[in-house]
Amino acid sequence: AYPFTSQSTYLLTFDNHNSVNGIREYALARGAHVKYLPVLPPRLRVAEDRLDEHLALAREDGHNLFAYPAQSNFSSVQHPLEWILKAHAAGWDVLLDAAAFAPTNRLDLTAWPADFVPISFYKMFGYPTGVGALIARRQALKKLQRPWFAGGTITVASVQGEKHYLADAPAAFEDGTLNFLNLPAVTIGLEHLESVGMDLIHERVRCLTGWLLTNLKEMKHTNGKPLVKIYGPVDTKKRGGAISANFFNPEGAVIDHSWIEQRANLHGISLRTGCFCNPGAGELALHILPEELTSCFNRPDHEQRLTYDEFRLCINAKASGAVRVSVGPVSNFADIEKFLDFVRTFLK
């Protein structure tokens, strides 16, 4: 619904969830320019001078959209909220993906007036799945142009008259029947977070994450080789509570992340493995080269379909993903110690 045209630019960081990456297809279909702003290994942060260069690409005669996550769902890097004001000054609308940030951090939209802010209630308090929200500034919402209509989004529609009238925003963007059976849970969840306090939640997660990072960094095989390689920040400065890493044997070869997940399941530990729907950060962290990807995607048998297992074979047995462990408001030190005990089983 964003009014992309051939005079528009869609700028996004390499570090973005696929839900944000996918917007590029709408932009390209309308002739807009799409630009990616890289993050730099090993910390997976953006260089400020590169940001300034890319923000200068705003087209004066078109709508420009800059999208980035407040917190990476791959590395847990917390990108500066100050970018919002900098981008506005350079002529950009800003989409701030706060899905990973909002569960454990206070976000003041008066101080940081992003135009569009998607959040996930499931990530904030674990229930219900499939219910989120797009928080949009009124002026930004007026820019959106729905390319179609559906039930629940119009006041009047006619077949013979070939006409429809959209409902006032935000109802014009809420397709179908709202999930009224689960929506009351959102109120309960928000009240619970408020009763605990976001500052307390933030500090608790920071302490647990710091303890986990410290212990993972210290784990070494008997020959001195590190067991764990952490992607992104190795301390708690400007980072969230998810840690992405790979495990290595004493010879320095990566241990397959899928196998680690299977082992974790047997120990009653829930992990996420893969690239976590964030291919840009994953490709840079794992040193997957553009030419390797091009060679893989251009194979005749990969024109229409490519499974994840086929992709893993295609990139010469490089690590195609990582292991992610997430610390949240209900995590405690016993959870951390159980995970660390599990990790120690890989030491040789």
Predicted regions: what is each one?
Residues 1-348:
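Pyridoxal 5′-phosphate
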